[in-house]
Amino acid sequence: VTGAQGEGVARREPGMFCLVLHSHLPWLANHGRWPVGEEWLYQSWAATYLPVTSVLRRLADEGRTRLLTLGITPVLAAQLDDPHCLDGMHHWLGNWQLRAHEAAGMPSPALRELGALEHRASAAALEDFETRWRHGGSAVLRQLIDAETIELLGGPLAHPFQPLLDPRLRAFSLTEGLADARARWGHTPSGIWAPECGFTPGMERGYADAGVSHFMVDGPALRGDTSVGRPVWDSDVVAFGRDLEVSYRVWSPRTGYPGHAAYRDFHTYDHDTGLKPARVTGRSVPAEKKAPYDPALAAVALDKHVDDFVETVRRRLRSESARTGRDALVVAAFDTELFGHWWYEGPQWLEKVLRALPAAGIEIGTLADARARGYVGEPVELQDSSWGSGKDWRVWAGDQVQDLVQLNAEVVQTALDTIDKSRDANPEQPELRNRVHDQMLRETLMTVSSDWAFMVSKDSAAGYARDRAHKHAHALREIADAVASGRGDVARRLAEGWNAADGLFPALDARRLPGREAGTTGPTAVSAGSK
């Protein structure tokens, strides 16, 4: 049974529908707790990663396959496997249950009812975590990958905005990211979610060199024609575009299902328990006047939005197929964290939609399915683009973040120059594993994470974002200065100390950084499987 098959299937509609989810958070472990830091990770884990994987597991148990395409960034995957994060998550779930227990004993009937609801949810989450997740997320996700429930999309280490990245570091970040995926899940992804859907001409050649066959862009990058994937320039690498008409039906910068009055309000907290007691009620209703959350009302809205989405996809498939004279592809793409973290009812909606679409005669599949089935058109001369504001690079390269752009350029140049000088000093010798170089590249990649510029541009915890970028830049400079002044022992101690602080990407190997000349690797070729 594939995603395109289900009980009571209606007349088959033309074309194929692909749902793509992008799962990502920056590295948060040991970098603050509240209001920004590990709490962000644990909230997303409890509200999104646990319930969404449970939805997929239930559907997989029914024999359904190739339901959606799931991107998981290496930096998020690392946190889902990290012992510190696993311990922190276990503690967070226990605390959630205690808070729910406290709410169940409150004088307010509405809070007591909410407490009972939350206690059941926290108990189920604890059981799921202790049964399946306690030793890391890789095993949970690998079951879904092995069963072909999902197609896995990979990506570069630490989620850099690739168009602004030095080509050598861009290539290194991507190959290391794909190797990280293989180490965790036993699969090397053939497709990637390019961070922020960022693109500049020439990147397609790097993708081809890394073995990437397809990637996501936003719809306007393909001039709005997303009815097929498009080979990029003269390569065989295919860009699939997000259909904004369908995607924006669910969530857009201005509207979407989660804003319905009956759904749980994300922003309103009961400060005694930390629980969210209210429904949206209305866009302009202040927090203190919002009505209590009612699951029954939310369920009615949810069913309407499932039906609305199925009808939206059906209309789009029919209209695009008629317009192009061939079966059309419709790709809807979202941040995974929308489902549960931002939109409490999102996982329920997701499960209902993945059942309802096939029942309505709509074929669903993955991006790899779409490529294999021939949903590919003529080549496109893809230009600079992203899925950010304006669909250009302003979020990551605009005036508001010029300080970060300059910081990133300086840090990257410092790291590359330091490693190049070390290689030049021993041109005839095999390059041995150098933990100092490894840590320099880790800190460089953490500095250039796209998250920091995004947070500053959106004025969302901008101070935290700038602090994180400068902290990693400081670590890089400190190590590089020790190397440049010939203090090798100091450089090694610093590298060990900074590595211990994060413990991130232990398999990263600086020997795989390409050399100065295009198309070359370092003095010694080292496979991505080497330790």
Language model: regions and residue ranges:
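Active-site and substrate-binding clefts of carbohydrate-active enzymes
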Residues: 8-65, 72-116, 120, 226-531
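Acidic (Asp/Glu)-rich catalytic clusters
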Residues: 10-13, 57-64, 136-153, 182-185, ...
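Short, solvent-exposed turn/loop segments enriched in Gly/Ser/Thr/Pro and often Arg
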Residues: 71-76, 156-158, 191-200, 367-372
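Glycine-rich phosphate-binding "P-loop"
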Residues: 154-176, 180
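CE4/NodB-like, metal-dependent polysaccharide N-deacetylase domain
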Residues: 170-194, 312-333
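Conserved short loop/turn motifs at secondary-structure junctions
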Residues: 188-199, 335-339, 461
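Hydrophobic, small-residue-rich alpha-helical packing segments that form membrane-like cores
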Residues: 203-212
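His/Asp/Glu-enriched short active-site or ligand-binding loop at hydrolase and phosphoryl-transfer sites
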Residues: 213-224, 363-366
